Every structure is written in C-alpha cells, then in structure tokens.
Amino acid sequence: MNLQKEMGMSVMWITHDLGIVAEMVHKINVMYAGFIIEQGLVDDIYDETLHPYTKGLLGSLPSIDEAPGTKLISIPGLPPDLITLPSGCPFYARCTYRRDYCREERPELESVNANGHAVACWRWREI
C-alpha cells in the first residue's frame, strides 16, 4: 500500500470477502455477473447497503457477537450463465425482492447521494 501512495496509483482487489476489503480500501464496487450493481465509499456500503446481492454478501459474514454455531446467511440459487445472460437484472433469479418487471430490463447505476453511492436495482428504495 505504500507503493500505491508513492506512485499515486489505484489498486483493485477482487474478492467475495467484504470483511477484509473494509480494512483495505476507501471505495467499493460490488459486481455481479460482470456488472457493477453497487458502488460507493466503504462506510456508505456498510451502513446503507442498497442492493440485495450486497446485503447477501454482508449477511454471510460471521460476527463475533453471534453465538458459536449460528447459521450464516447464504444467497439462494446459482449465478447466471455468463454466456447467455438474462435481459433484465442479472441477479433476478436469486433475488428475494424480485418482481416481474425486474426480468425485463437491466437497471442502470443510479446515484443515491453526493458521496458517489450508486445502485443498479429497480427496488432499492423499497428494500
């Protein structure tokens, strides 16, 4: 990380472990099936999670406050076939908040605050 500061360059971490990422980065891009579905400052992503996939990733992290043996949350279903992606939201088949219209058109990233927090979900205001 010192080299990053000295050279003024960015570093990209690709991982499913958001617990580790929070200590290493300032901004997060959450991707699903090749699309950025949520992005923002670490605090915004952790404190105001907007996308169901991001909620699932964070919900799957163990907590020191939980009793031993507490079952972790898992995201149901399987990722889509990347060769034949659906036309709508790529997370549609696994989303517990889905509606029929989510299957028809892929949502674009929508800015939700001045810090750059953005989400690609038709229902983010409701969930």
Describe the residue ranges of each PLM region.
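Charged, flexible cofactor/metal-binding loops and thiol motifs
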Residues: 42-127
